[in-house]
Regions:
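Pair of pore-lining "gating" transmembrane helices in MFS-fold secondary transporters
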Residues: 2-27, 195-196
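Conserved MFS/SLC helix-loop-helix module at the cytosolic interface between two early adjacent transmembrane helices
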Residues: 57-94
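Residue-level signature of mid-helix packing/kink "hotspots" within the transmembrane helices
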Residues: 23, 51-61, 146-147
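Cytoplasmic helix-loop-helix junction between adjacent transmembrane helices
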Residues: 105-141
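Paired small-residue
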Residues: 98-106
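Extracellular/periplasmic helix-loop-helix junction of adjacent transmembrane segments
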Residues: 28-57
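Helix-loop-helix hairpin linking two adjacent transmembrane segments in secondary transporters
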Residues: 137-182
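Small-residue-rich transmembrane alpha-helices and their cytosolic helix-loop interfaces
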Residues: 15, 52, 130, 135-143, ...
């Protein structure tokens, strides 16, 4: 593998480590429930469940439609900035569960864009057995990211539950790595038939 592709992988794997950023609230779900005792526990659990996942799916559909006009690198970076800002917003806006759920929804949009575009970058630059190998390592970095985000979140949230969301500021490091290392990616051909 040449140096250029190794550089691309550094950017792709940096993005992969942030895909599980939606797990930041996992260690503090009980504390969030205690902070909003009048809210249904199922609603509290939505900060890590259905809301960010559904929004991620929506973002994947939209980003694949934009792939003929917007580079995959830009999609990844914009998605990642959205995740960071939405997550960090809970440090300020945490007076109601609705605010936390709204932040989770916006994070889901960003995460969907990041995942879809990084998967597509792998397809653009790696083929055959090399692609299978790269995807296997990619999955490892996604899992490693999940471990890191939950560990950092648990430490930060030990005093106040919403302090866990400061973990999203760590993403600045990954965004810089992506900006330096990610390739633009190939624009997808415009589709004549609308899949919707």
């Amino acid at each position: 593998m040449d140096k250029t592709k190794i550089k691309y992988l550094v950017g792709i794997y940096a993005a992969a480590m942030c895909i599980m950023g939606m797990l930041v609230p996992v260690p503090i779900v009980a504390s969030v429930a205690a902070a909003f005792p009048n809210e249904n526990i199922a609603a509290v659990q939505m900060i890590i469940g259905i809301i960010p996942l559904m929004m991620a799916l929506s973002a994947m559909l939209v980003s694949s439609q934009l792939a003929s006009r917007v580079s995959k690198k830009k999609t990844t970076l914009v998605g990642h900035v959205i995740v960071m800002l939405a997550g960090a917003s809970v440090l300020v806006f945490h007076d109601s569960l609705g605010q936390v759920l709204a932040a989770s929804a916006v994070m889901g949009l960003g995460l969907g864009a990041v995942q879809n575009s990084t998967d597509a970058l792998i397809a653009d630059y790696f083929g055959g057995k090399q692609r299978s190998f790269v995807m296997g390592i990619y999955s490892t970095f996604v899992a490693l990211g999940g471990i890191i985000w939950t560990m950092v979140s648990g430490i930060l949230g030990s005093a106040e539950w919403f302090h866990s969301y400061a973990a999203y500021f760590i993403m600045i490091i990954f965004i810089v790595i992506e900006a330096v290392c990610l390739p633009e990616g190939h624009l997808e051909p415009k589709r004549k038939v609308n899949v919707f």
